[in-house]
Amino acid sequence: MALRFPRFSQGLAQDPTTRRIWFGIATAHDFESHDDITEERLYQNIFASHFGQLAIIFLWTSGNLFHVAWQGNFESWVQDPLHVRPIAHAIWDPHFGQPAVEAFTRGGALGPVNIAYSGVYQWWYTIGLRTNEDLYTGALFLLFLSVISLLGGWLHLQPKWKPSVSWFKNAESRLNHHLSGLFGVSSLAWTGHLVHVAIPGSRGEYVRWNNFLDVLPHPQGLGPLFTGQWNLYAQNPDSSSHLFGTSQGAGTAILTLLGGFHPQTQSLWLTDMAHHHLAIAFVFLVAGHMYRTNFGIGHSMKDLLEAHIPPGGRLGRGHKGLYDTINNSLHFQLGLALASLGVITSLVAQHMYSLPAYAFIAQDFTTQAALYTHHQYIAGFIMTGAFAHGAIFFIRDYNPEQNEDNVLARMLDHKEAIISHLSWASLFLGFHTLGLYVHNDVMLAFGTPEKQILIEPIFAQWIQSAHGKTSYGFDVLLSSTSGPAFNAGRSIWLPGWLNAVNENSNSLFLTIGPGDFLVHHAIALGLHTTTLILVKGALDARGSKLMPDKKDFGYSFPCDGPGRGGTCDISAWDAFYLAVFWMLNTIGWVTFYWHWKHITLWQGNVSQFNESSTYLMGWLRDYLWLNSSQLINGYNPFGMNSLSVWAWMFLFGHLVWATGFMFLISWRGYWQELIETLAWAHERTPLANLIRWRDKPVALSIVQARLVGLAHFSVGYIFTYAAFLIASTSGKFG
């Protein structure tokens, strides 16, 4: 018999039903479960796939640059960033009638185009790119890197170039190289680019390879570096009247600590950012020399962890045994990496809008909204993945003997306390927040809005004041002119910072009130409930009260029949599955809040958010319904407009989302019956019965149907909100 898919599992390849295809796809990347896998091949496969991942990333970014250079309007956008709409790429659609062609011909283009809401124009402009030729050069370079990555992946699959397991498990060398190489050297290189290309570019000086060695980034060259007069690099910064991209009002400083924003671009000072990256480079270059390798100096990770024992002996054996547990478990390492990356991605969302790094991006409202939402959703998926792999670690890699009485064992020992406390926090937040919203709703409905329960967020306001916001009247820390912190920073970063914090046109420390207090607690409810489900899923992965012996059932078992009192919904996979719904729900609230707050800020009617956000009907009527009106108006009796594509996507998103429920709320028997009926009809129909198939069609398993349902739910949910967000924002602000 010919080799059938999947080749990595002989058992599955011989399955006579359509299960073979679905289970094959589901386990294709679960290298550990493949037939002839060894630990060495497992590590080598993963290592080689990283090169493929890099190749895809480089190809993708190369494509962005190439399409903007070919079909965009970068050069005309550079001339007037605030009024020219950036073009992502052309639209070729033979079905377009004349009204559509007119509606989508924008940004000075000759035919229908898509507008870019990704911020790439602002990014490329800030880092010194100015012409289409620059973009083409970048695209070709990234294409070259993509090819190099593919060659690297191929090379490391050849017998001679396959690294050994001991190389993969050399934690100290990896830490040193990743800290000093990935973070340190790349930050230093980026500082170099900012100082040599971007900062001169912001001052009207065009630095390229042909004049790179002739243009001094600073009038005094490297003199101050070698003589220790580093402060000279901070003298004569750009003035507040500086016009970005020109020499008008420009200074000569390259490394500053001005604080606040460039008045014209509303973004952080480039010289501040160069300084920041230099500092990061220094810290990580030092950190990358801290661990003991061939030279016998520095820390040993194992020694560090073994020494971490809580004093007094009351809290067990601390970190003993952790080194081998983590170093031998790819799932533990992946869980840690995903948790870190998820947090970082969410922080990127928060900081990209509040402290914009790219010139003029703060005035491009749709881009700000799109980037915030994009990064928050990605953070949510990555964080749930962290807990999923944490659970797989407990099932496949956790060894109780190796971890006796250390922090991992103690987490498992008192998991009931952890889960019950999280449960209590979630219940408390949920009932109290909903209670306040519903009370306020009823008061509004009965025409007595003055009877609402409105709570001022005084602690959060106090924290904002401590950072220098004066409008609340708290005389504390940086908002107190007599404090030592205030006086210490007055000569350097503080004037710029205080000016930015107290200027109401940006997103730094937005003024908050009762509506913010309520939605903050609604979000806290979502975060705690999502965490509860994920933590419980991981801590109960090996066994729980009802089913103490889950280890051999694996990560994603569906149900084990009624024998144990019914074991549906208690696998670690089920916890992940439920948590993703809560994660989407939570990020929905987060993005609703962010978007509504900002729309009213940008339109200059903040009172609408303040007054309507304290009760549920306000959210439904004044945010969702009011802002979807443009969307539903994409097609109207007068033809179509440039929002029609979002109107269509809004409908399509709802369709995909609703399709999810078809898989989520149905029984497997119903599907099997349906499939048998369809197969029977097919075989008895002339012409149709000429087409045969080898695999007997069977319904999806419980776990598969849930996965398909979850995928449709997630994609539809995000598609729908993306269309709403982009259309409602671009419809208002162009």
Curated annotation (Swiss-Prot):
**Cofactor stoichiometry and binding remark:** P700 is a chlorophyll a/chlorophyll a' dimer, A0 is one or more chlorophyll a, A1 is one or both phylloquinones and FX is a shared 4Fe-4S iron-sulfur center.
Residues where chlorophyll a B1 binds: 654
Work out whether the entry's keyword set contains Hydrolase: no
In this chain, [4Fe-4S] cluster is annotated as bound at 559, 568
Keyword set for this entry?
A: 4Fe-4S, Chlorophyll, Chloroplast, Chromophore, Electron transport, Iron, Iron-sulfur, Magnesium, Membrane, Metal-binding, Oxidoreductase, Photosynthesis, Photosystem I, Plastid, Thylakoid, Transmembrane, Transmembrane helix, Transport
Provide the GO biological process annotations: photosynthesis
The keyword Transmembrane helix is annotated on this UniProt entry: yes
What EC number(s) does its UniProt record assign?
1.97.1.12
Q: Which GO terms describe its molecular function?
A: 4 iron, 4 sulfur cluster binding; chlorophyll binding; electron transfer activity; magnesium ion binding; oxidoreductase activity
Which sites bind chlorophyll a B3? 662, 670
Record's catalysed reaction(s): reduced [plastocyanin] + hnu + oxidized [2Fe-2S]-[ferredoxin] = oxidized [plastocyanin] + reduced [2Fe-2S]-[ferredoxin]
Q: Where does phylloquinone bind?
A: 671
Major localisation: plastid
Provide GO CC annotations from the record.
chloroplast thylakoid membrane; photosystem I
Q: A Pfam family name for this chain?
A: PsaA_PsaB
What membrane topology does this protein have? Multi-pass membrane protein
Q: Where do the TM regions start and end?
A: 46-69, 135-158, 175-199, 273-291, 330-353, 369-395, 417-439, 517-535, 575-596, 643-665, 707-727
Quote the subcellular location field of this record: Plastid, Chloroplast thylakoid membrane
Return the broad EC class. Answer: oxidoreductase
Kindly give the InterPro entries that the UniProt entry links to this protein. PSI_PsaA/B, PSI_PsaA/B_CS, PSI_PsaA/B_sf, PSI_PsaB
Protein family: Belongs to the PsaA/PsaB family.
Briefly state the protein's biological role: PsaA and PsaB bind P700, the primary electron donor of photosystem I (PSI), as well as the electron acceptors A0, A1 and FX. PSI is a plastocyanin-ferredoxin oxidoreductase, converting photonic excitation into a charge separation, which transfers an electron from the donor P700 chlorophyll pair to the spectroscopically characterized acceptors A0, A1, FX, FA and FB in turn. Oxidized P700 is reduced on the lumenal side of the thylakoid membrane by plastocyanin.
Q: How does it assemble?
A: The PsaA/B heterodimer binds the P700 chlorophyll special pair and subsequent electron acceptors. PSI consists of a core antenna complex that captures photons, and an electron transfer chain that converts photonic excitation into a charge separation. The eukaryotic PSI reaction center is composed of at least 11 subunits.
NCBIfam families the UniProt entry points to: psaB
Protein's name in the database: Photosystem I P700 chlorophyll a apoprotein A2
Question: Which species does the entry assign this protein to?
Answer: Spinacia oleracea
Query: Which gene name belongs to this protein?
Result: psaB
